[in-house]
A protein has these predicted regions:
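Preference for short coil/turn "hinge" residues that link or interrupt alpha-helices
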Residues: 22, 42-48, 99, 121
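An amphipathic, hydrophobic-aromatic interaction surface with interspersed Lys/Arg
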Residues: 26-78
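Amphipathic alpha-helical protein-protein interaction segments
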Residues: 59-64, 68, 75-120
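Generic N-terminal initiation segments characterized by hydrophobic and/or small/turn-forming residues
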Residues: 2, 16, 52, 83, ...
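Arg/Lys-rich, low-complexity, intrinsically disordered N-terminal tails that contact nucleic acids
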Residues: 1-38, 110-130
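Aromatic-residue detector
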Residues: 45-48, 90, 109, 127-129
């Protein structure tokens, strides 16, 4: 099993051809997915870590995050009743959104990886270093 399948992620670095301006959001987005797009795109553009090839992944993240919120809103409007089928859909959408967020640097651990230069940063105070 390769180390990349065990959850070890490569260092996030600036892209060679990063987007410098957020493209228009897809027309099929619902209001919650659109709100997520508007929230994350300035952050991702500012970090210079995404290119045009990443837009499909970002679209999927926004749709999944919007779906999680939409199902939660429906649950609250139904008086807090939990529909087992919708809970399963919400759970899978949340998992997908969380996984994509980690690859895009949108969670605390991946942001720390960006700030520190990755997991392979040398440790200057290693007592065993010669």
């Amino acid at each position: 099993m390769s180390k990349h399948l065990r959850g070890v992620k490569p260092q996030i670095t600036a892209d060679r051809e990063p987007l410098v301006k957020a493209p228009r959001p897809p027309s099929f987005f619902g209001p919650l997915a659109l709100a997520e797009w508007k929230r994350i795109m300035p952050v991702l553009i500012g970090r210079r870590v995404i290119c045009a090839a990443d837009l499909g992944q970002i679209e999927t993240y926004c749709v999944m995050a919007g779906l999680v919120r939409e199902i939660e809103t429906q649950r609250q409007l139904a008086g807090g009743v939990i529909d087992g089928r919708l809970f399963g859909v919400q759970n899978r959408a949340a998992q997908t959104a969380r996984q994509i967020a980690a690859t895009l640097g949108l969670d605390p651990v991946s942001r720390a990886r960006i700030a520190t230069g990755g997991d392979d940063a040398p440790d200057d105070d290693d007592p065993l270093a010669v």
